[in-house]
Amino acid sequence: MFKFNEDEENLKCSFCGKDQDQVKKLVAGSGVYICNECIELCSEIVEEELAQNTSEAMTELPTPKEIMDHLNEYVIGQEKAKKSLAVAVYNHYKRIQQLGPKEDDVELQKSNIALIGPTGSGKTLLAQTLAKTLNVPFAIADATSLTEAGYVGDDVENILLRLIQAADFDIDKAEKGIIYVDEIDKIARKSENTSITRDVSGEGVQQALLKILEGTTASVPPQGGRKHPNQEMIQIDTTNILFILGGAFDGIEEVIKRRLGEKVIGFSSNEADKYDEQALLAQIRPEDLQAYGLIPEFIGRVPIVANLETLDVTALKNILTQPKNALVKQYTKMLELDNVDLEFTEEALSAISEKAIERKTGARGLRSIIEESLIDIMFDVPSNENVTKVVITAQTINEETEPELYDAEGNLINNSKTSA
């Protein structure tokens, strides 16, 4: 145990060599002494090392290929979108590392990203996985909850509060984070014609988002909600925050068709109709987003657009089984904790995928379909020691019948509801 020694004479600090009468305090250990000045110096060194470790993720920026390899572990398909994101994110954080004393007059501007694709195509998962890959704070916001300042709804600054909370109120970390704003298409201007009725959840929100997208020092209420005159605010610089905006943009294919029908020489509008949906989305231009209802200034803040494809049965089956955190692996592990094996037949995986397409929910709807088929089993099996294996078949999914249940000898148990 450490103690203060004031009785002994000619004691010196073992680190700096100062006598005890030259310092305020001298702390004794087992044959060694340390003064208050050296303690303060050690404390500063430790704090600097901790700060350096905190920012280590940013000093060891993965290459675009490494980013994409990590995305491939969790996100199936969407190769073009993943490549676009990997390059854009790499350039964004490389730009942050370059900030400081300028060797030339070239200023690298921030490039926010828009993800356009149908519900359940993986927009949110891509953004989440990117943040995890880079070890930066991440927040999700829904554009439909935002309104212009002064109206009922959330101020845009509340988006920043979520990021600050994700960074445990470490502002430096938050200022290098990623914010994903979903359903950005829902704040499109209601029409291209001006109206005497104020569009507080459309163009008004776009105008409010402009500054934080570009980069500004924003005042954020620490408790959320509306700002109050006497409330102390958190100041955060949004210049280096990466914004990823996602939306389905339902009907934008028609906007692209009209443009192609009018501008492609030698092709009639009927021939433009022959473009399939994916081919049309691949040809999206800023003027299409403007015609859809985004204002030009807003489009200018989001120069990178990545298109996500509609997922087919094969892609959905792969999503069910291949990623590190695939749903089949999750539910298999869940029942394994009750000493029960879970198996999905190939036909069952196809049936689950087809039902998700039928419901137009994409990958987002896969979990609910599996949950529906397993809810009774997960309720009953922990109380039934006879069941050692559960097999999900296509009939289980399509006809909502009970899965096949087997005992330890491999005998099929009666398909009626299991009992305790």
From Swiss-Prot:
GO BP annotations, alphabetical order: cell division; proteolysis involved in protein catabolic process
Residue ranges occupied by any ClpX-type ZB domain in the UniProt entry: 1-54
GO CC annotation terms, alphabetical: HslUV protease complex
InterPro entries to which the protein is assigned, alphabetical: AAA+_ATPase (IPR003593), ATP-dep_Clp_protease_ClpX (IPR050052), ATPase_AAA_core (IPR003959), Clp_ATPase_C (IPR019489), Clp_protease_ATP-bd_su_ClpX (IPR004487), ClpX_bact (IPR046425), P-loop_NTPase (IPR027417), Znf_CppX_C4 (IPR010603)
PROSITE patterns assigned: CLPX_ZB (PS51902)
Residues annotated for ATP binding in this entry: 118-125
Keywords assigned: ATP-binding, Chaperone, Metal-binding, Nucleotide-binding, Zinc
Residues where Zn(2+) binds: 13, 16, 35, 38
Keyword ATP-binding among UniProt keywords: yes
Molecular-function GO terms, alphabetical: ATP binding; ATP hydrolysis activity; ATP-dependent protein folding chaperone; protein dimerization activity; unfolded protein binding; zinc ion binding
Matching Pfam families: AAA_2 (PF07724), ClpB_D2-small (PF10431), zf-C4_ClpX (PF06689)
Family as reported in the entry's similarity comment: Belongs to the ClpX chaperone family.
Subunit structure, interactors included: Component of the ClpX-ClpP complex. Forms a hexameric ring that, in the presence of ATP, binds to fourteen ClpP subunits assembled into a disk-like structure with a central cavity, resembling the structure of eukaryotic proteasomes.
Alphabetical list of HAMAP family matching this protein: ClpX (MF_00175)
Function noted in UniProt: ATP-dependent specificity component of the Clp protease. It directs the protease to specific substrates. Can perform chaperone functions in the absence of ClpP.
Name of the protein in question: ATP-dependent Clp protease ATP-binding subunit ClpX
Species annotation: Staphylococcus aureus (strain MSSA476)
Gene symbol of the encoding locus: clpX
